[in-house]
Regions:
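Amphipathic alpha-helical
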Residues: 136-149, 293, 304-323
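Short, glycine/charge-rich flexible loops or terminal/linker lids adjacent to PRPP-binding catalytic cores
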Residues: 308-353, 363-364, 391-399
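Generic beta-strand/beta-sheet core signal
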Residues: 106, 171, 179-180, 191, ...
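Secondary-structure transition/capping motifs at alpha-helix termini
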Residues: 126, 147-148, 283-287, 305-312, ...
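Conserved short alpha-helical segments that host acidic/polar catalytic motifs at enzyme active sites
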Residues: 1-223, 228-286, 292, 380, ...
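A conserved beta-strand->alpha-helix junction
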Residues: 130, 135-138, 311-322, 419-437
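PRPP-dependent phosphoribosyltransferase catalytic core
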Residues: 159, 174-175, 214-220, 240, ...
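Phosphate/diphosphate-binding loops
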Residues: 157, 208-209, 213-217, 224-225, ...
């Protein structure tokens, strides 16, 4: 698997608890979603304090840092950059000012129209410290809140402007907000801490973050919903009307932790079922089935169970090496595979093997693992992908925004098989994948090219010449003036700026 992660977000309102440490623990549970940087912002009733830096959660924070961040509300973020450069300036949360106070925002996802929105804000003398879409969102909310003097109005106006996939958490000194894109592409769940009736709440990208802080799952944040939590309790309103539901299906395939729950089912059980379906569609006559750790293992178990073949541990993962796909260049990715994985020769030597991975994206990782297994003595190596071919780039929070990098967009199955050096190669069908996941609407644009949110027309160079989606959008630029005029017409914003 060579996909880049997206990000993890967390928010907590718990006035009588150590919100900074709760956030720190939750970010540990979400560390798999991003390893570039980490950050925490805390509201203490008077102002917002923030600490963020590049590195893992354990590298950014120590006890002294957390002791210096008392408060009643907090948000946290662990980042893998999908829009904008990496570095301290791109670490989240991002800050913006509202009159005499501050807000801090953390974001998972990607905004497809952030370039044009950044230009609009720059023309209004708003400056930026980074080139990230997340800072654009923070500055948009700050701008509209300063104009209307209502934070929820500022959030709703921003939601009317931004396009793409997003789950965002935001704090001011005395309140927590959580909101999600109207298609529900990026995940966000609500949980409760403490006894029934206590005003202690958390929001997170995955339920595994609720578990680690002792929270009980309540529900998903609805697509288009804005949740506000303060001393007055929890309230909800719709910032946008929901559109056709389009949950990112790669949360099931790869991104989410196996112990997270989506639609009432553990991600582990879904991946196990994907492996069984894969075995039905692309069986192989072998002695041993192994999984590529960690995300390929549940599917490998299901594959072996369906074919009644021995399942074994043929690859050992070095858990102290950052994930290979986090590496910024192809050369470093290739080196990273060997740093991260090693084959068990006494398990695989002399055996015909099926190696199950969650996906084949660029082909680099698969090629190197096949060679590792051959070097360890495997007589045959058959590769199976527990997801369909990744043919189309993603623009909603996964760093595959260039079709030229996707091996299945350029090669047939047989050509990929030869490229990675396997004896055979098989992919789970899209129909088979959809039969395994909970029944709901999904974004499967990376497999099908059906994009739920229109792609800006100037993204055309990111597609191969023969592959263009149907819904390239000519321009998003004019909408800014329309939203401003609507606020003026409703008496929420002064007509003279």
């Amino acid at each position: 698997m060579e996909l880049h992660e997206e990000c993890g977000v967390f928010g907590v309102w718990a006035p009588d608890r150590d919100v900074a440490r709760l956030t720190y623990f939750a970010l540990h549970a979400l560390q798999h979603r991003g390893q570039d940087s980490a950050g925490i912002a805390v509201g203490d009733g008077q102002t917002v304090l923030i600490r963020k830096d590049t590195g893992l959660v354990t590298e950014v924070f120590n006890n002294d840092d957390l002791n210096a961040m008392p408060g009643k509300v907090a948000i946290g973020h662990c980042r893998y950059g999908t829009a904008g450069a990496k570095g301290w300036e791109s670490a989240q949360p991002h800050m913006s000012s509202i009159d005499e106070t501050l807000i801090a925002l953390a974001h998972n996802g990607t905004l497809v129209n952030f370039d044009s929105l950044r230009e609009e804000l720059s023309s209004r003398q708003i400056s930026f410290r980074s080139n990230t879409d997340s800072e654009v969102a923070a500055q948009l909310i700050g701008y509209f809140t300063r104009q209307t003097h209502r934070l929820r109005t500022g959030i709703a106006a921003t939601m009317n402007l931004i396009e793409g996939g997003y789950a965002m958490v935001l704090i001011r000194e005395n309140a927590l907000y959580a909101f999600r894109d109207p298609n529900g592409i990026r995940p966000l769940v609500l949980g409760h801490i403490g006894e029934e009736g206590e005003n202690n709440w958390v929001v997170a990208s995955e339920t595994c973050a609720l578990d680690i802080v002792g929270a009980t799952y309540v529900r998903e944040v609805a697509p288009g919903e804005i949740i506000r939590i303060s001393d007055s309790g929890l309230s909800s309103e719709m910032g946008l009307s929901p559109r056709q539901q389009a949950d990112c299906i790669f949360e099931q395939v790869y991104f989410s932790r196996p112990d997270s729950i989506i639609s009432g089912r553990s991600v582990y059980s879904v991946r196990h079922q994907m492996g069984r379906q894969l075995a039905k569609e692309t069986p192989a006559d072998v002695d041993l089935v192994i999984g590529v750790p960690d995300s390929g293992v549940p599917a490998a178990e299901g594959f072996a169970q369906e074919l009644d073949v021995t399942f074994g541990t043929g690859l050992i993962k070095n858990r102290y090496v950052a994930r290979t796909f986090i590496q910024p260049t192809q050369q470093l990715r290739e080196l990273g595979v060997r740093l991260k994985l090693n084959a068990l020769s006494d398990v695989v030597a002399g055996k015909r093997i099926v190696m199950v991975d969650d996906s084949v994206v660029r082909g680099t990782t698969s090629k190197q693992i096949v060679q590792l297994l051959r070097d360890a003595g495997a007589t045959e190596v058959h590769v199976r992908s527990a997801s369909p071919k990744v043919i189309w780039p993603c623009f909603y929070g996964i760093d595959t925004a260039d079709q030229h990098q996707l091996v299945a967009a350029k090669m047939t199955t047989q050509e990929i098989c030869e490229y990675i050096g396997a004896d055979s190669l098989g992919f789970l069908s899209l129909e088979g994948l959809l039969a395994c996941v909970p029944s709901r609407g999904y974004c499967e644009s990376c497999f099908s090219g059906r994009y739920p949110v229109a792609i800006p027309e100037d993204f055309h160079q990111r597609f191969l010449p023969e592959n263009k989606p149907d819904n390239l959008h000519p321009s998003y630029a004019l909408k800014f003036d329309q939203v401003e005029q609507q606020l003026i017409d409703e008496g929420l914003m002064p007509s003279e700026q």
